[in-house]
């Protein structure tokens, strides 16, 4: 039997609102609400209250901040992007902390003199408790994989043909409504004086070559080059491309995905359209391969976990 609580009584009365007892049920609910029973107040019922606002996030010509990674994630699922932007994210995972550490060690190779692979590995081991405070074989295996990432990075660093301009370089450029801000892992210049952006990835699985050519994160970097985002470090505003370098891929050979020189006019229009959508009042939820591990699926209207009780 249903427990004899005020919430249960109200629930029974609400279920009667669609029956021949509707008039009596409504009168009792009204009386309970006037007596201070919160669950009897229709304004507390999910699906009854009006939207708090229908105004766009960024009205008119107000700029919209677009990071290179958010441009990519927004096109995958606008709802996920909005919920995460609004605070719907978990704390940093060990994988995220490790990724940040590997990027920092890769930057040290350029920023400090006398850095060798052995030095980087030693720094990693000394700071491991900060990355993964757990003990046991799982942590040990993770550390071995991290050391392998450093080895792969060193192979790339020693064999690359372009000159390093700088590492961990921030940029801030404006394209229409979009204010593109971010940081590149590494900026290189080729023999012709053109700039090439490198983004290190610690994930294991590279995207396809076709997806790399359309990757919005890399396109954003190339737009930043063209818009003078790195003129403080190098005079060139000509891009010769960009690449994702996968340090976590379990093979001896460095796995990379390059993006050739883009059509700047088309890329700018693409980013501007994304900025317009990011500043809108509504966001579309989309089903894709990342739904299974999505941290905000409990709020997603197209997933069972996130549907409202009133459709």
Model-identified regions with their sequence ranges:
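Mg2+/Mn2+-dependent nuclease catalytic core
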Residues: 169-269
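C-terminal, charged and often intrinsically disordered regions of DNA end-processing helicases
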Residues: 1-111, 309-311
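Hydrophobic (often cysteine-bearing) scaffold residues that line and stabilize catalytic clefts
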Residues: 79, 94, 98, 102, ...
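Short, polar/flexible loop-turn hinges at active-site or ligand-entry regions and domain interfaces
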Residues: 88-95, 114-115, 207-210, 231-233, ...
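Metal-dependent nuclease catalytic regions and adjoining charged, substrate-binding loops involved
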Residues: 13, 17, 21, 224-311
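A non-catalytic, helix-rich entry segment at domain boundaries
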Residues: 101-174
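Active-site-adjacent bridging/hinge elements
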Residues: 73-83, 121-122, 188-199
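Glycine- and acidic
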Residues: 63-67, 82-91, 105-108, 128-137, ...
């Amino acid at each position: 039997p249903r427990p004899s609580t005020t919430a249960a009584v109200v629930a029974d009365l609400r279920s009667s609102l669609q029956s021949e007892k509707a008039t009596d049920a409504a009168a009792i609910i009204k009386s309970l609400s006037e007596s201070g029973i919160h669950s009897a107040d229709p304004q507390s019922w999910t699906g009854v209250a009006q939207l708090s606002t229908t105004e766009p996030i960024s009205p008119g010509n107000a700029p919209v901040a677009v990071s290179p990674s958010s441009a990519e994630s927004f096109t995958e699922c606008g709802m996920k992007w909005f919920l995460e932007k609004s605070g719907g994210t978990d704390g940093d995972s060990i994988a995220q902390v490790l990724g940040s550490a590997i990027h920092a060690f890769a930057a040290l190779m350029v920023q400090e003199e006398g850095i060798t692979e052995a030095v980087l590995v030693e720094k990693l081991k000394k700071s491991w408790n900060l990355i993964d405070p757990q003990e046991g074989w799982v942590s040990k295996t993770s550390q071995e994989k991290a050391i392998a990432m450093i080895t792969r990075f060193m192979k790339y660093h020693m064999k690359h043909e372009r000159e390093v301009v700088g590492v961990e370089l921030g940029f801030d450029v404006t394209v229409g409504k979009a204010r593109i801000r971010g940081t590149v892992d590494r900026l290189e210049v080729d023999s012709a004086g053109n700039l090439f952006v490198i983004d290190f990835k610690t994930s294991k699985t590279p995207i396809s070559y076709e997806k790399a050519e359309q990757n919005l994160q890399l396109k954003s970097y190339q737009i930043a080059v063209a818009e003078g985002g790195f003129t403080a470090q190098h005079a060139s505003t000509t891009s010769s491309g960009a690449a994702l370098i996968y340090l976590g891929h379990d093979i001896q050979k460095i796995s990379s995905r390059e993006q050739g020189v883009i059509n700047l006019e088309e890329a700018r229009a693409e980013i501007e359209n994304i900025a317009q959508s990011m500043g809108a009042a509504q966001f579309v939820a989309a089903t894709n391969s990342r739904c299974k591990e999505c941290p905000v699926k409990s709020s997603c209207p197209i997933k069972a976990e996130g549907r409202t009780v009133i459709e």
